[in-house]
Amino acid sequence: MLILTRRVGETLMIGDEVTVTVLGVKGNQVRIGVNAPKEVSVHREEIYQRIQAEKSQPTSY
């Protein structure tokens, strides 16, 4: 795992097309903004896990 330190307003790049910007810090919460192409899915981890669980469930008709 790569660990980076960023201040509010600073950005990191993932590849050529994805940026992650620190928008604010309040207590133990960090607000981030993600800019990515439409074909790149961006989800919070708990939402991603729910999507994956739904995909693995058999479809009943």
Swiss-Prot record:
Example of a GO biological process term: mRNA catabolic process
Localization (cell): Cytoplasm
Encoding gene, per UniProt annotation: csrA
Superkingdom assignment: Bacteria
Cellular component GO terms, alphabetical: cytosol
Primary location group: cytoplasm
Keywords: Activator, Cytoplasm, Repressor, RNA-binding, Translation regulation
Protein's UniProt name: Translational regulator CsrA
Organism: Pectobacterium carotovorum subsp. carotovorum (strain PC1)
Role of this protein: A key translational regulator that binds mRNA to regulate translation initiation and/or mRNA stability. Mediates global changes in gene expression, shifting from rapid growth to stress survival by linking envelope stress, the stringent response and the catabolite repression systems. Usually binds in the 5'-UTR; binding at or near the Shine-Dalgarno sequence prevents ribosome-binding, repressing translation, binding elsewhere in the 5'-UTR can activate translation and/or stabilize the mRNA. Its function is antagonized by small RNA(s). Could accelerate the degradation of some genes transcripts potentially through selective RNA binding. Controls extracellular enzymes, N-(3-oxohexanoyl)-L-homoserine lactone, and pathogenicity. Repressor of virulence factors.
Matching InterPro entries: CsrA, CsrA_sf
Entry keyword RNA-binding: yes
Family: Belongs to the CsrA/RsmA family.
A GO MF label: mRNA 5'-UTR binding
Pfam families xrefs: CsrA
Record text on subunit structure and interactions: Homodimer; the beta-strands of each monomer intercalate to form a hydrophobic core, while the alpha-helices form wings that extend away from the core.
